[in-house]
């Protein structure tokens, strides 16, 4: 058999590491797919299947999508349950000696997708990790778009099914015992559109799990996190973090706090009751309109909409917490003027949770920074209004709300009010912010004068 061309050999070597993914292989201004990936992707994406010389007698099946419009195609693959590995050129072609080096920089899966084009801003995109043992299961969930990260232990299969229904994750990873459990996996995949996959056994090695948790959360032991008596949660949390590191190729600094909760703190609602009550979607067509959430949702921000949805999906049962929430509601109802003022200030606030994530991951564009700055500007006014309410929740809110004045002042002094979307277009920083930048800008515009 004839040998593959050097480029095709490189493709095969990369693909070998990501057998469960569609490989987007960067060539110039396109992401190209070959062999079985090309056949599959061309059908799903409804694009032309062609061929490419690969060094063998038969041409390799090939299809491709433009680099600048890849999100549209990538999202369609994700919506159809595929994982996509993004393989980029990792060296300057002008400096390359021979074939340009390429490597996978990120794997996009249903539970790790951060595309603004596909995600509902009012709904969390959860990735769930489950470690099931004989008597207990550990459940860990994360929304990498917001940094929300939590874990619990569950004592029965029925309660585990209820927890899955409560979060309705986009993706679940689990061990063999979970995948062999008496759960309705077909319903999860077909009706709930949950992608489910097996986690490699080495992900559940105790020392590896404890090490990755300690490094991610900045602690020396599990006791400091409250996990010393929760081995199942250590396994599910450690496996989840390993999966994120393997797919995102990033330190994920914004995932830095783990919330440990008990399912006994909330009302347990089985899947049938949850559907029949139409809490967040209607029974017939699965739309928000007509559900309890649709009736109650008068929120002004995407963050508030997600929080309200979570409140509805997991009702409180602790009397003190219920009364604290009711006291806050009563205070709002009794002071319509202040309530309406707060709503006016909330209305223009952008999705700060997801903006902070993009900034942390260095995927934000200059206009994201302006959106973040304009939201920060409103925090002192909201905090002043919150101080008017004398209830437990509002007092805690006042104490916890950091105005981040120093960050606002930094953005105000540095970024132009109407910057471009793309960093490479320039014109991001204000004149006078940094002398070195001013010198370079002057050299660009007044170069002839210099000469």
Go through each PLM region and give its residues.
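Conserved interaction-surface patches within small, structured recognition/assembly domains
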Residues: 334-338
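Charged catalytic and DNA/RNA-contacting regions of genome-maintenance
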Residues: 1-331, 344-360, 364-451
């Amino acid at each position: 058999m004839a040998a593959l061309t050097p480029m095709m050999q490189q493709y095969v070597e990369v693909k070998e590491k990501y057998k469960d993914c569609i490989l987007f292989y960067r060539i110039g201004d396109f992401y190209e797919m070959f062999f079985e990936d090309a056949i599959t992707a061309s059908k799903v994406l409804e694009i032309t299947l062609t061929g490419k010389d690969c060094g063998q007698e038969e041409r390799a099946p090939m299809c491709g999508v433009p680099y600048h419009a890849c999100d549209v195609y990538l999202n369609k693959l994700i919506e159809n349950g595929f994982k996509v590995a993004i393989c980029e050129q990792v060296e300057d072609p002008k400096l390359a000696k021979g074939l340009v080096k390429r490597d996978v920089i990120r794997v996009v899966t249903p539970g790790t997708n951060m595309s603004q084009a596909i995600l509902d801003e009012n709904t969390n995109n959860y990735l769930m990790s489950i470690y099931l043992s004989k008597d207990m299961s550990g459940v860990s969930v994360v929304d990498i778009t917001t940094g929300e990260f939590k874990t619990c232990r569950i004592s029965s299969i029925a309660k585990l099914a209820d927890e899955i229904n409560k979060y309705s994750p986009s993706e679940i990873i689990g061990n063999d015992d979970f995948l062999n459990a008496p759960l309705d996996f077909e319903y999860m995949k077909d009706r709930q559109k949950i992608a489910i996959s097996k986690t490699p056994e080495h992900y559940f090695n105790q020392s590896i799990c404890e090490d990755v948790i300690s490094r991610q959360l900045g602690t020396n032991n599990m006791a400091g996190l409250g996990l010393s008596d929760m081995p199942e949660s250590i396994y599910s949390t450690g496996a989840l973090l390993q999966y994120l590191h393997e797919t995102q190729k990033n330190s994920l600094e914004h995932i830095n706090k783990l919330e440990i909760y008990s399912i006994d703190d909330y009302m347990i609602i089985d899947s049938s009751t949850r559907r029949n009550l139409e809490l967040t979607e209607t029974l017939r067509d699965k739309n928000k309109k007509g559900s309890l959430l649709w009736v109650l949702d008068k929120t002004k921000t995407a963050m508030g909409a997600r929080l309200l949805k979570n409140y509805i999906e997991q009702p409180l049962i602790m009397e003190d917490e219920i009364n604290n929430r009711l006291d806050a509601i009563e205070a709002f109802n009794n002071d319509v003027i202040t309530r309406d003022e707060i709503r006016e200030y909330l209305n223009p606030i952008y999705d700060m949770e997801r903006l902070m994530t993009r900034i942390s991951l260095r995927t934000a564009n200059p206009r994201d920074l302006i959106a973040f700055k304009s939201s920060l500007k409103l925090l002192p006014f909201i905090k002043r209004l919150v101080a008017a309410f004398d209830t437990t929740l509002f007092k805690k809110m006042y104490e916890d709300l950091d105005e981040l004045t120093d960050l606002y002042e930094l953005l105000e002094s540095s970024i132009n009010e109407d910057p471009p979307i793309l960093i490479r277009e320039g014109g991001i920083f204000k004149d006078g912010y940094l002398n070195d930048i001013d010198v370079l800008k002057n050299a660009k515009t007044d170069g002839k004068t210099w000469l």
